[in-house]
């Protein structure tokens, strides 16, 4: 909403990176004159810049302000809370441990609010880090999670840390909406012969939804738009389920739903209610 309002205002502004991981949304904003730059130094001096939902490091914020750039901060509040947690941890002499994908923009931004963070992708990665040096199990560690990670990954790390570490504290910072969406997708996939996951292929939440659905459903399709859906190639199924990544706008979900509803398929009725809620 912030990006669209800014685009309509007509005032010069750029986005630092894609506002969300959805190419269709980014393209739509570009059509309205709001473009993305990839590096902070590409933001014109004295202009306005939108910080994306994944957040940016403290160094980026400081650099932009020093150049007189007006920051419109669209960082997810849940992500901002993690920035505060890791900062506070280091102020108390603790080492932040970030559970997430090391190259994900959100994780990079969180790490950028620390001086000496540790990033682990999962339980095995944590185990390897802990036992590289025996003294690490006695360090004061503060665990946080990438907001779009899964409960399975987080709980695996918590279990390992509680077993091996003598001074660890845990902040479950997985987004509640993300966790709920993942669990609903898992349950829905178990009842369907085919699951359609709608979202950008580069979105971590969308890819994780597809992986979760594949655990209980043998046929999973990942599509970005309705035109990606080749109905002639869809295997027969008594029931078809639809779910979507958090960054997928309601109008794209509706396009897919309408296209599939035009065919002779029974689509899980609860999805219609979910769609109505997402449009409100």
Which residues make up each language-model segment?
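The feature marks the mature, well-folded catalytic cores of soluble enzymes
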Residues: 1-280
């Amino acid at each position: 909403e912030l990006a669209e309002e800014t685009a309509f205002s007509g005032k010069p502004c750029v986005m630092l990176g894609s506002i969300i991981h959805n190419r269709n949304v980014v393209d739509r904003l570009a059509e309205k004159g709001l473009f993305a730059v990839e590096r902070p130094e590409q933001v014109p001096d004295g202009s306005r810049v939108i910080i994306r939902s994944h957040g940016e490091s403290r160094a980026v914020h400081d650099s932009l302000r020093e150049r007189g750039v007006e920051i419109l901060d669209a960082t997810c509040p849940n992500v901002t809370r993690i920035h505060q947690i890791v900062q506070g941890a280091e102020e108390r002499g603790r080492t932040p441990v970030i559970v997430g994908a090391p190259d994900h923009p959100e994780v990079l931004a969180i790490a950028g609010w620390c001086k000496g963070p540790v990033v682990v992708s999962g339980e095995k990665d944590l185990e390897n880090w802990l036992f590289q040096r025996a003294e690490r199990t006695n360090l004061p560690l503060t665990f946080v999670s990438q907001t779009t990670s899964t409960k399975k990954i987080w709980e695996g790390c918590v279990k390992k840390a509680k077993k091996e570490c003598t001074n660890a504290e845990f902040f479950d910072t997985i987004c509640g909406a993300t966790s709920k969406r993942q669990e609903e997708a898992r349950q829905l996939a178990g009842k369907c012969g085919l699951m359609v996951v709608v979202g950008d292929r580069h979105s971590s939440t969308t890819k994780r939804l597809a992986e979760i659905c594949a655990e209980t459903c043998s046929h999973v399709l990942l599509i970005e738009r309705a035109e990606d859906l080749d109905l002639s190639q869809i295997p027969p199924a008594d029931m078809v389920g639809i779910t979507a990544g958090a960054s997928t706008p309601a109008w794209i979900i509706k396009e897919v739903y309408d296209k599939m509803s035009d065919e002779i398929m029974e689509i899980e009725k609860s999805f219609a209610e979910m769609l109505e809620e997402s449009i409100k």
